[in-house]
Curated annotation (Swiss-Prot):
Keywords on record: Ribonucleoprotein, Ribosomal protein, RNA-binding, rRNA-binding
Ranges of compositional bias, category Basic and acidic residues: 103-124
Matching Pfam families: Ribosomal_S6
Biased composition (Acidic residues): 125-141
Protein name per UniProt: Small ribosomal subunit protein bS6
Region (Disordered): 96-141
Function: Binds together with bS18 to 16S ribosomal RNA.
Length: 141
């Protein structure tokens, strides 16, 4: 069996069906003896360019190990499902199980957002303390 990275884009009006689609696709792979090494739902994102006058899509990424037969069936499912507006299948040399760059970037963004919010509250408290110490120094003079 070979390893593949599969990314598919779902029409934004069909986002609620993504869970069912992922279940169907994982079931198809596992019934043929394959394995799902990584599954990431990247959510609804802006497209770089419009596809059929659609500017956003729901992104899903799978790293799988499967047979050629299962992959062909999966690609047929993508082709005949109107909700899937694009798909990409890349053959990999080995299983990839760590978080993707997209997921890492999202985590970094949320961490930076949290850090930005914390110092604002901390700076306000420190600013009050430093002003008090400055005032007490001035009072001693």
């Amino acid at each position: 069996m070979r390893h593949y990275e599969i990314i598919f884009l779902v029409h934004p009006d069909q986002s609620e069906q993504v869970g069912g689609m992922v279940e169907r696709y994982t079931k198809l792979i596992e019934e043929d003896g394959g394995k799902i090494h990584r599954l990431e739902d990247w959510g609804r994102r802006q497209l770089a360019y419009a596809i059929n006058n659609v500017h956003k899509a729901h992104y899903v990424m799978l790293n799988v190990e499967c047979t050629g037969k299962a992959l062909a069936e999966l690609e047929d499912n993508f082709r005949y499902n109107d909700a899937v507006i694009r798909n990409l299948v890349i053959r990999r040399d080995e299983a990839v199980t760590g978080p993707s760059e997209m997921l890492k970037a999202e985590e970094n963004r949320s961490e930076r957002r949290e850090r930005r919010e914390r110092p604002e509250h901390a700076d306000g408290a420190e600013g009050d303390d430093s002003n008090d110490s400055d005032n007490s120094d001035n009072a001693d003079e």
